[in-house]
Each structure stands twice: as structure tokens, then as C-alpha cells.
Amino acid sequence: MTVVVDTNVLPGMFTTGHGYRPIADAWFDGIFVWAVSTEILLEYEEVLVQLKGHAMARRILALIERVGALQGNLHRVSPSFSFRTIPTDLNDDKFADCAIIADADHIITSDKHFSRLVGSGYKPQPIALEKFITRFLTPA
């Protein structure tokens, strides 16, 4: 399974004890492939610097790169086309473009703008992080 992680999910993923942490743990364990683009990594960096400071942002991004290299579960894509699936928020469009190019199954997000992907004909579908955890990471 391949997913794109929206920026609103990222900071909590790398916080011990946070409700979003199971997503990072599952990725560390190789349960899913995380698709990213350079634009997305730059946005991650910007938000992490604002929320956690430069040093912690660098550590988290380095961890993402290292785990991805070791596990082979970080899929980098370079979208050369914009599908304009989210015209109401062009900043979110980069996540949809990445997901479409990577043939991702889901975009993990709490952002309602991504609901435009539902029924759009594109494979990637938005999924709330709680639903992702319940559906894919909780033992049956």
C-alpha cells in the first residue's frame, strides 16, 4: 500500500505518545510505502521548523530519508504535470499530484479540501488518520 501524508499529520507522527505516532511506527515497520515529492518535503520542512525548531526539523527529515533508504519504503516522485484536482487550495494540489503520480492508495489527511478526490476517477482517496489507523493498523 502506498500513501501520501498531508502536512497536518506529520508533526504528531514523530511525537512519542501522540495519537498519530502509530502511523510513523507502521511506516518504520514497512507496512506501507510513503510517497513524497520535493515540494512536499519542502513544505514538511517549513512546518516542522515552525513547530519544532530547526534542529528537530533536520533530525526528523534526516530520519525520514534514512528509514526510507534502509527500508526502501520512501517513494520519491517528481510530478511534471498538475492535475488541478483541488482548485480551492492550490497548496494541497501538490499532495494530490504526488498521490496520482505515485499511484498511491490514500492521502492521510484531516483536510476537507481533499474530499474533491472522492469520485473523481483518480485512484488515491483521502482517508482520515483515525480511519487509517483503525482500518489498516489495528489488529482484527
Where in the sequence are the language-model features?
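Alpha-helix capping/helix-boundary segments
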Residues: 9-10, 40, 113-114
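Short, flexible helix/strand-to-coil boundary loops that buttress conserved ligand/catalytic motifs
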Residues: 14, 48, 118-121
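PIN-domain endoribonuclease scaffold, especially VapC-family toxins
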Residues: 26-82
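Active-site neighborhoods of divalent-metal-dependent phosphate/nucleic-acid chemistry enzymes
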Residues: 71-107, 112, 116
